[in-house]
């Protein structure tokens, strides 16, 4: 995969100092924000002047709890135990990953992202959600699969988020424990698991058959743009 064309991240609400300088050096022209309206309001991106933002709310049509609502549950030990206990947290995220494939707002968001990357006028580009692991993780995973990266390498790349976010969520887990909660309840929400990506892949194969068919029929990306996307992102042998 060519370097310097597509980037992923968590939200950019704390971008400043050396990080802002490093970001500017990447020459990123467009940021695609996959978050909900309440997430964007809670922590707006801080971007260099001249960087365009495109909002692609993946979960706009979801009837499940929003990410901000889930975080609010962390403050109530009883509600957290009810929602996340007995495998509830993992089951909730598996539902969300299934929504990434079938939800109309998700397909619209990912279609617009893929179409823009295929066109190339927006690049270098970056896409992100709040933690950069779920909505962003699925986008990165199916992009890599579409480009022909082997399944095991895609899974390994997806699971890197678990290591990189471990320190980020440590204060949240410690605070939950200090209030008397069991931090293990929150682990399914603050990390990534193979079963999450496998759930999305299973739904994709069930509904569309192949990655290429998902991009063509689920996202509505036609032959020309699909060819353009591969040509732009695959490094020549």
Give a label for each model feature.
Residues 1-126, 138-237:
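Cys-dependent protein tyrosine phosphatase-like superfamily
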């Amino acid at each position: 995969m060519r370097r310097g064309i597509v980037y992923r991240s968590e939200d950019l609400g704390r971008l400043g100092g050396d990080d802002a300088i490093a970001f500017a050096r990447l020459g990123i022209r467009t940021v695609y924000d996959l978050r909900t309206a309440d997430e964007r309001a809670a922590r707006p991106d801080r971007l260099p002047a001249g960087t365009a933002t495109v909002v692609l709310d993946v979960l706009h049509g979801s009837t499940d709890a929003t990410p901000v609502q889930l975080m609010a549950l962390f403050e109530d030990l009883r509600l957290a135990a009810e929602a996340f206990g007995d495998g509830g947290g993992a089951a909730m995220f598996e539902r969300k990953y299934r929504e990434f494939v079938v939800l109309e707002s998700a397909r619209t968001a990912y279609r617009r992202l893929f179409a823009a990357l295929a066109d190339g006028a927006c690049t270098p580009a970056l896409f992100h959600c709040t933690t950069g692991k779920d909505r962003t993780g699925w986008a990165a995973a199916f992009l890599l699969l579409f480009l022909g990266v082997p399944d095991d390498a895609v899974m390994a790349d997806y699971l890197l988020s678990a290591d990189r976010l471990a320190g980020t969520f440590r204060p949240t887990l410690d605070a939950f424990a200090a209030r008397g909660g069991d931090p293990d309840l929150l682990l399914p929400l603050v990390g990534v698991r193979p079963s999450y990506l496998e759930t999305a892949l299973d739904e994709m194969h069930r509904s569309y058959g192949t990655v290429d068919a998902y991009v063509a029929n689920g996202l509505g990306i036609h032959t020309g743009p699909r060819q353009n996307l591969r040509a732009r992102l695959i490094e020549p042998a």
